[in-house]
Amino acid sequence: MKENIHPPYKQIKVTCSCGNTFMTGSTLDRELHLEICSACHPFYTGQQKMVDTAGRVERFRKKYAKRRAANASPEDEKK
């Protein structure tokens, strides 16, 4: 392995939205925040639960709302 070309690898704290925290190795210089981890993911827990995707949907709608409004023709508004 070449010297001085790889980023430093260190321990960082990972925090999930469920409150679970753990340490892992990474090249990041900051803490990492997750929406889902193995402690709350339905596959690992064996429980059915709804995963909140509303945040992603709303972000998508906001992003493309301006394009949709700009491209709307008068015929679209009549329908």
Curated annotation (Swiss-Prot):
SUPFAM superfamilies found in the cross-reference section: L28p-like
CC annotations in GO: ribonucleoprotein complex; ribosome
Cysteine pairings via disulfide bonds: none
Listed GO MF terms: metal ion binding; rRNA binding; structural constituent of ribosome
Keyword Thylakoid: no
InterPro entries in alphabetical order: Ribosomal_bL28/bL31-like_sf (IPR034704), Ribosomal_bL31 (IPR002150), Ribosomal_bL31_A (IPR027491), Ribosomal_bL31_sf (IPR042105)
Record text on cofactor binding: Binds 1 zinc ion per subunit.
Segments forming a coiled coil: none
Keywords of this entry: Metal-binding, Ribonucleoprotein, Ribosomal protein, RNA-binding, rRNA-binding, Zinc
Lineage: superkingdom: Bacteria
Regions crossing the membrane: none
Cofactor: Zn(2+)
Subunit and partners: Part of the 50S ribosomal subunit.
Family: Belongs to the bacterial ribosomal protein bL31 family. Type A subfamily.
NCBIfam families recorded: L31, PRK00019.1, PRK00528.1
Record function comment: Binds the 23S rRNA.
Listed name of the protein: Large ribosomal subunit protein bL31
Organism for this UniProt entry: Coxiella burnetii (strain RSA 493 / Nine Mile phase I)
Upper classification of the organism: Bacteria, Pseudomonadati, Pseudomonadota, Gammaproteobacteria, Legionellales
